[in-house]
């Protein structure tokens, strides 16, 4: 029963002792004698309702409540995936600052190195990357669009990071600044044709289409396709939507595009060589590709993300490997810049928006979906804040025929 273990739990329970030891190691001074300020005091409530402070003096930043035996077993295993699932299922509750709680992730382990070996490596090889993408993308992006629209920016509904001048700047202004940057950096003008890879809920299609640009947005998500078709009809945009995988896209009877924009889709295109070859086929010589992505170790996704957020072989951009593949092509790297803080702010603002809609989300879609996404967004914010993940944007230029000079690097940061 759910109370059998609870009755046996006391303040001397091994979990309390182990948590205190791990917290002490996490907050111990480093080689320079500086304490880890990320480790915060928190309160642990056991199933018998006894409360135990973990950490030093001061007000607890958050409270972990163990609700059931399953929650006790998950936390006692110090298994990150098990703890995440216990939280989503209601076997663990957390009150207070979730971002502060996630700064204690180093006390947990992710002991599932081979759990997703099949979906990451073997399944795309056996069944084909394109076919598996169609299933994997649906698992995330075909959640009811109204759910996403509750917490994305209200102006463009962008699901990629923004560019912020101040930490307290609105999500809407940060997103619009990034879109303007990509638009201008690619030299896009009214009447030109632009390919938008993974159009989402019509963010770039709307931004550029309202300026007279003929945008072709590619998607393999049903919800995305429906949203963009409705947007085009409602606003009278000179744009089109193509339901096709980018790697299979072969337009017939049309010239190459004047620009290609890839907002946060590189993570879903892990075959860099094939992707760059497709860029080269679809882009006019002398024109540019804008892309941005979160970056880090290739296939270095936590088990929670691989199982519950982005299934399959979605992978952070591996900058070293990507640039090595670019070097094999005619493309020139014009701009590359670090966006880690911008991505942190984007995830933080999304998470805050979602938390503000907590009651509505739970009423319409259930507690599990709410907790899955709030945990995902705050854990992503934590990864960017701590440097577990980074992010970059890049501009590539395809030289015109007979070009005698390289474009040159305008920015590296």
Predicted regions located by residue number:
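Substrate-binding/catalytic lobe of Class I Rossmann-like enzymes that use SAM or dcSAM, i.e.
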Residues: 295-393, 397-403, 411-412
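Conserved SAM-binding motif I beta-strand of class I
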Residues: 214-219
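Conserved SAM-binding strand-loop segment of SAM-dependent methyltransferases
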Residues: 235-248
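A short glycine-rich, Lys/Arg-flanked "PGG" loop and its adjoining helix->strand segment in the class I
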Residues: 273-288
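Conserved SAM-binding loop of SAM-dependent methyltransferases across substrates and taxa
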Residues: 201-212
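A short acidic, Gly/Pro-enriched loop at the edge of an enzyme's catalytic core
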Residues: 247-260
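Feature captures hydrophobic
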Residues: 1-175, 181-185, 211
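Conserved class I S-adenosyl-L-methionine
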Residues: 191-198
